[in-house]
A protein has these predicted regions:
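Catalytic nucleophile-His microenvironment captured as a short glycine-rich beta-strand/loop
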Residues: 17, 103-129
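A short, charged, amphipathic alpha-helix used as a generic interaction element across diverse proteins
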Residues: 54-60
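Short, solvent-exposed loop/turn elements at domain surfaces
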Residues: 24-28
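Short alpha-helical segments and helix-capping/turn motifs at coil-helix boundaries
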Residues: 1-4, 104
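DNA replication initiation modules
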Residues: 5-8, 18-22, 34-53, 69-94, ...
């Protein structure tokens, strides 16, 4: 199940479990990080609540968790999260998501829902905005669920410092003019996008 997860990530003690939980008054479930050693909530600012990969996998089974996740700590690993960009029924991938995947070229997998994309990278993120529309980029004080369900071309876990700067500027960066700012603020397109078969074989 987790064979495709890069070994370099597995060797780091940044792992947690996670579980779907619904807080009172909310209409959706959150993916809450869980300390896989004791079943209590994990904290992004407390590494003592993280563990090694094998312990996270065992904790998932022991505590009946929904999955495992990776905590970012600002030590040269970051993640890109693109929500609601893939239709598993039609296998259509949003063109903007396809562009980000093709440009960054690092380990890419489907989110637990099967409709989002997570990209895990080495390197440094540019300073500035972390989220705009459906695109998020984080290197610290956040965690990503990790499925091992690799998507598209099997890009290796790579240093993306230079490549991600281009995508950060395009999708998250502050624009110098109002027209540019309005364009950048638009959410990911919701219409029909790129067919995933094409993205795997041709676009990516």
């Amino acid at each position: 199940m987790y064979e495709k997860i890069p070994l370099e990530l597995k060797q780091l003690p940044h792992w947690v479990g996670w579980k779907y939980m619904q807080h009172p008054g909310e209409d959706h479930k959150r993916k809450v990080p869980i300390n896989a050693m004791d079943g209590q909530p994990a904290k992004s600012n407390d590494p003592t609540t993280w563990c090694d990969f094998d312990t996270a996998c065992r904790g998932k089974e022991r505590f009946g968790l929904d999955g495992i996740g990776f905590m970012f700590s600002g030590d040269g690993i970051f993640g890109i999260d693109i929500d609601h960009c893939y239709d598993p029924e039609t296998q259509e991938l949003d063109p903007a998501a396809a562009e980000i995947i093709e440009t960054v070229q690092s380990y890419t997998e489907l989110s637990p829902s099967g409709t989002g994309i997570h990209i895990l990278c080495k390197g440094a993120l540019p300073e500035g905005r972390k989220r705009r529309g459906a695109v998020e980029m984080y290197s610290t004080l956040r965690y990503f669920t990790v499925t091992g369900n690799q998507f598209g071309l099997e890009y290796p876990f790579s240093d993306c410092t230079e490549r991600v700067a281009v995508m950060h500027r395009k999708y998250l960066g502050e624009e110098e003019n109002a027209a540019g700012a309005q364009k950048a603020a638009l959410p990911m397109p919701t219409g029909r996008g790129t067919n995933a078969d094409m993205s795997v074989d041709a676009i990516l």
